[in-house]
Curated annotation (Swiss-Prot):
Cofactor field: Mg(2+)
Name the record gives this protein: Anthranilate phosphoribosyltransferase
Binding site for Mg(2+) 2: D234, E235
GO molecular-function term, one example from the UniProt record: magnesium ion binding
Family under the similarity heading: Belongs to the anthranilate phosphoribosyltransferase family.
Gene Ontology annotations of biological process type: L-tryptophan biosynthetic process
Amino acid sequence: MRIKTRNFIMQTQQILTQLFDNQPLSQEQAAFIFGNIVKGELSNEQLAGALIALKIRGETIDEITGAVTALLAAAEPFPAPDYPFADIVGTGGDNADTINISTASAIVAASMGLKIAKHGNRSVSSKTGASDVLTALGVNIRMSTEQARKALDEIGIAFIFAQQYHLGFKYAGPVRQALKTRTIFNILGPLINPANPKRQLLGVYSPELLKPYAETNLRLNHEHSIIVHGCGLDEVAIHGLTQVAELRDGKIEYYNLSPKDFGFEPQPLESLRGGAPEENAKILTALLQGKGSEQQAQAVAMNTALLMKLFGHEDIKQNAQQVLEQLTTGKAFETLTKLTTY
């Protein structure tokens, strides 16, 4: 930890006072404070106070954007490719304990020729997060940056494990665990992929998050983002309406999608229940081999259909049918098998 200058102390105190007075921060102020949080420059008491003040008032777009830019600047670098690539990620926190739909969709999309740099972490709120199920499937989630980029180039998918790139998060860990409540860090997770993709399918646990994420991605110059909330899920829903915020070419459009828009009938959410990592790994293995249930295949088809839209495949009904056909070939399982060799 560096010696704190008088200027640093005054600036930090001014920002904290502003937060405690219920005043919003500018993007620059948010970048300053979060840049210093991940350097370990704030005391636990200061950090706890800042996080609670932000949570109680509600984080602004400026604050989220400033925090994202600071955390990306502090992250270990990932060499982003020149070709188009996307991320598919969820906030978690929907408490539904479904199978890992986003992870399966990422693998299927890669087997169809799309490039997916999937950013993820260990589960906090569900039984099995992306990294938990991938580990159970035999994937080395701690592959080096070079290996991850090689996998992205060669087989179309890389897993970027958050803990390996955001080393400064350790400074916030004890406070976050002590608070035992969602903070701005839960909002930031899906936005801080170090590969910095400009295309993203993002699932959120609450419909109230659609607008903040869409507007933040607009500020972050995303080319095409689709943010979804599906009837309580941070995925596209097989059991009801999905609320959507789509950012494209600097404009945000809000609309709803039903299973019928993808060519399907609604299915019960219960059919997607998962469990521990080993159980979810077995389900995903069968699914990627074309031996999953109709409902599981439908969930992956609907989510992958929107992922395909980010790459210019506009007809989501046609996309969903292509995904179902792809699942029957077993090629998605081949892609997973290749991923385990990196």
